[in-house]
Amino acid sequence: MSEATTTLDGWYCLHDLRSIDWAAWKTLSSDERGQAVSEFLNVVEKWNEVATAKKGSHAMYTVVGQKADIMLMILRPTMEELNEIETELNKTTLAEYMVPAYSYVSVVELSNYLPADEDPYQNPQILARLYPELPKANHICFYPMDKRRQGDDNWYMLPMEERKKMMYSHSKIGRQYAGKVRQVISGSVGFDDFEWGVTLFADDVLQFKKLIYEMRFDEVSARYGEFGTFFVGNILPDEKVEKFLHI
């Protein structure tokens, strides 16, 4: 049997994507819509306070295309907190005019290839990646993915050293985009329908296409990668939420 990779796990992660029922939203009076927006922003302010205390992080983006209208990415220390956040949001008036479009549950993950005598949880660089402050980049790209398990192309039957070698080659491509694309990898085996979630942040949206296309030619993606639905969007600052929902 092949050896399993040891992972380092950080904050739990929820991607919550929703569509707005614009027709129903229009039936509210201007005052009613204003109250609903204020209530929602009060919830977001609680998230901001958590982020300031460095006990979690979040990101809010509008989604381009018909798959959804808004994407929320929430990071918290426990799965229970993610559930509480989702429930609190569902109890708001605004949620009555939202339709669930997609969700993904995972945990921020790194593969542990450090020497056995080194404690990764004492390494500041690793801690910053396991418990990240999500960037306020202009754009986001999220997609889930699996490693293929078919016939001779079975990632999980490969020896550990071969997997390490291929992942090192794969990661070199990503490092070429340092400063252009920020990446958060989250593991979801046993949590959701795919094995990983990949979230990319960039100020130049074209960098998503360039990075993902270049990685397609690497063996890890070309031979072993299987991908789910892609979602891409634009940042939605708190101060622009009212304008986004204005009728």
Curated annotation (Swiss-Prot):
Molecular function terms, GO-annotated: heme binding; metal ion binding; oxidoreductase activity, acting on the CH-CH group of donors, oxygen as acceptor; peroxidase activity
- What domain of life? Bacteria
Q: Residues in the active site?
A: Y143
Alphabetized UniProt keyword annotations: Heme, Heme biosynthesis, Iron, Metal-binding, Oxidoreductase
Q: What is the E.C. number?
A: 1.3.98.5
One of its GO biological process terms is: heme B biosynthetic process
Annotated residues for binding of Fe-coproporphyrin III: R129, Y143, P144, M145, D146, K147, H170, Q183, S221
Name the cofactor(s): Fe-coproporphyrin III
Pathway linked to the protein? Porphyrin-containing compound metabolism; protoheme biosynthesis
EC class, as a word, reads oxidoreductase
Q: Does the keyword Oxidoreductase apply?
A: yes
Q: Which reaction does it catalyse?
A: Fe-coproporphyrin III + 2 H2O2 + 2 H(+) = heme b + 2 CO2 + 4 H2O; Fe-coproporphyrin III + H2O2 + H(+) = harderoheme III + CO2 + 2 H2O; harderoheme III + H2O2 + H(+) = heme b + CO2 + 2 H2O
Cofactor binding note: Fe-coproporphyrin III acts both as a substrate and a redox cofactor.
Q: Which InterPro entries match?
A: CHDC, ChdC/CLD, Dimeric_a/b-barrel
* A Pfam family of this chain: Chlor_dismutase
Function of the protein: Involved in coproporphyrin-dependent heme b biosynthesis. Catalyzes the decarboxylation of Fe-coproporphyrin III (coproheme) to heme b (protoheme IX), the last step of the pathway. The reaction occurs in a stepwise manner with a three-propionate intermediate.
Protein family membership? Belongs to the ChdC family. Type 1 subfamily.
Please report the name of this protein according to its UniProt entry.
Answer: Coproheme decarboxylase
